[in-house]
Amino acid sequence: PYTLQTTWAAQPAVLLPWFRDHKPEVLEKTKWIMSMKDYIRFRLTGKVAGEITDASSGCLVNLDTRRYDRRIFEILGIEDCYSKMPKILESTDISGYVTKEAEKMTGLPEGTPVAAGYFDIDANALASGVLSDQELCLIAGTWSINEYLSKEAPREIEKKKNTVTL
């Protein structure tokens, strides 16, 4: 009820308990838990941060507070992971600036602002022009996703459907 979505096998809410049970040494050595996009942003800026649309898609965020929720980590038996989660930024926040080291590696000018960014599905909706609750978008790809905007998150999730609320 906190995350307002169902889980699937590649989410942190599923993967972290698996690591706890099968490869605890990996979690013991882990300093931060973040998405790939967050890691790339970290390498560009040197700043550790998460981003709300990626973070919420992992089933560890309480969407009412838009923050990681210790209760979710306790329910999943991964309490030790809670302190390894980075602060969550809004998608349009500037998370930092390209460092001198990143400039040498990428050719991006030092000091270039780096936005937190969007989860791919959210970015797709924006790129498709879904800007109000009067429009919807269909993604005919790996998942065949239908997406729309709503002022209110769905509170009743049908168990037969994979619902993601971001």
Language-model features and meaning:
Residues 1-166:
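Glycine-rich phosphate-binding/catalytic subdomain of phosphoryl-transfer
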